Each structure stands twice: as structure tokens, then as C-alpha cells.
Amino acid sequence: MEMLAAIRERKSIRAFLRKPVPREVIAEILEASRWAPSGSNRQPWQVTVATGETCRALAERLVARCYERQPGSPGTGSAPADVDSRVAALRADLEGIAARMGKSLWEFVVAGSFRLYDAPVVVVVSNPSGRGGDVAPFVTTMLLAAHNLGLGTCWLGYPLAEGALIREMLAIPEEERVRAVVALGYPDPDSPANTYRSPRNEIASFVRWIGFD
């Protein structure tokens, strides 16, 4: 797949087929991801990949915590007006998709995130260095590589609140901080959850050109 097409076409996948992902395919994704940039070439990432019963058990524990703690739905905080308008639009779109699936927005997005959207694989990126920002290019590269190989991903924010539980269940060293949680698998083409692609602003709305004709 041509690179720019992969960037434009990639989207968050929230429903997966019950189809195992071969280890060699995941290794190919991570082989590409390791070339991501990092400050001073520190490469400050450790990756834990779980599937099978371990992945299912983690999802069960996470969603149990979710129902105990009842975190808020997206868009319930405060942000600048332009950001709030985008979040409100996203929320409305996702509410419509959730309704088609017979779920509330909270069940679909919040509980779904903690459930890892029933993905067959979870990828956890951690590091001990405190350089959390350097993980973002690695994860972004991973998402694009997965899309290129026909897999879907969802970069999950909600499970980060349960970093200690994730470390415990996946035997991640205590000195490492969980920086990213990614659901990975083959997209379910028949699910309404995967029909949506959130829009993006045109570059004229956020780019300043200096010194060009």
C-alpha cells in the first residue's frame, strides 16, 4: 500500500473478527515500528504483546474495574471552543453508531475501551525513562504498519487509568510506566462500529505559511 494512502485510510477499529493474528505478522508490524524516531535515538520503548486467554482475562479485569469506577464518557470535560465543537460532533456520531448496536455511548466507547473491543491481541507499550512523548511516534508507526498489512487497531486511552493492573497481569516490571494500550486484530467488516471515520480539519485552518509566494 502506498504510504500516503495508508495515512489517509487508517481509522480506529472498534469491532474485530474472532480470528487469531499470527505472531509473525505482529513481528513484521513491530519490525517496522522500531524505525520510528526518538529523541537522541533513545528508543525508550518496551513492548508486551498478549493474546489468547491472557488477553481475554485482562479485558475481563479491566471492564470490571470500569463498571466499579464509572469513568465519564468522552466530551464531558472542558476544552477550547473549537476543540469542544469537534468533540461534540464526534460524540453525536458515536452515539448514533452505538444506538445501531443497541448500546449507550458509555457502553460502546468507555466500557468497550476497557474491554479492548474484544480484540484478539493487545499491545502495551511501556518505558521506565519518563520520556512518554517518544512513545507516540512508535505507536503511530505501528498503527500504520498494521493497516498496511490488513489489520485494524484502536489506540485506547481509558485503560491507562489501570496501569498498575496491566503491569500486574502482563508481568511488566514495576519501574515501567504503561504509556500506550492498543487493541489489534482483523476488522469486522459487517459491524456498524467500523463504518465511521472521523473528519479532519483542512490545513488552511491550522497552518501558517511564512516566506512562501
Language-model features, listed with the residues they occupy:
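Acidic, surface-exposed loops and disordered segments
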Residues: M1-D213
